[in-house]
Amino acid sequence: MNKPFCDWFSRPPVRRYDGIYYYDSDRDADCFDESDVAIWRSGRMKRNFHSDFFLNNPASRRLVDAIIAQGDPVVEIACGPGMGLMPSVKQLAPDHVCLATDANSLVIEEWKRYLDGNETIKNLDLAQFSLMDIPFRDNTVPAYSGYIGLSSTRNGEEGHERALREIYRTLTENGFFYTIETWMDTEAMLRVFRESGMTPWSGLESDHPTPTWRERFLQVGFEIVSEDVFESRTLTADDNELGEAAEQLGIGISVISKAYILQKN
């Protein structure tokens, strides 16, 4: 782990290996296994690392350009096997100082394996920790970035709130959070769950409307510098079982992703 990141931690890792700090956070992570690893190793990680997907969308390109223009070290949250915005930042600014993080140790280990074996990359560190328990000191991180990192947080609305408050706590005064998050039509989702007999997802409650990301960001204290539609579509069978059930019932579930530049007040 290189500077400045190694100076930001408030407590030692559970273990250190090959320059990576591990904080034993797999319980809060997406569930990946060896079948996923086989897909990643078949070329998926290489395609993800060299993808121009975010560079070709005006909303996400605005985030990437802003990260580079700001110039400060940036921490990618919940990077997953796509590594979020970091590959795009590295394509345009190879020397930019970045830390990619995820709660899943397998994701981090596989990124380390891929990068060491296939790329000549500098100023890109890796760490494992949960967004709901970020091991950084207060007011230390100048910039975070993410792609549906908050949207995929476990434990429903409670998990979203905990993760967002951790990001806000650890950002420096006037620090930035560049993120793309997804909102889904919860009323339509609940209708599909009822009519299909499927068990509703944890944290999805019919008597409490799900807040928008704008509402969540403002509640925590962020200033919304910019908000742009990244993608607007309908959930399909290719997404998951809920999308399949929705198609069979003829119910459209709106999925809207927006790109935000947020600043800590």
Predicted stretch roles:
Residues 171-177:
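Short glycine-dipeptide loop
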Residues 50-71, 87:
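Conserved alpha-helix/loop element of class I SAM-dependent methyltransferases that forms part
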Residues 178-201:
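Conserved class I S-adenosyl-L-methionine
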Residues 153-166:
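A short, conserved alpha-helix within the catalytic core of class I
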Residues 204-221:
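Short alpha-helix
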Residues 81-133:
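Class I SAM-dependent methyltransferase SAM/SAH-binding core
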Residues 145-146:
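A conserved beta-strand element that flanks and buttresses the S-adenosyl-L-methionine
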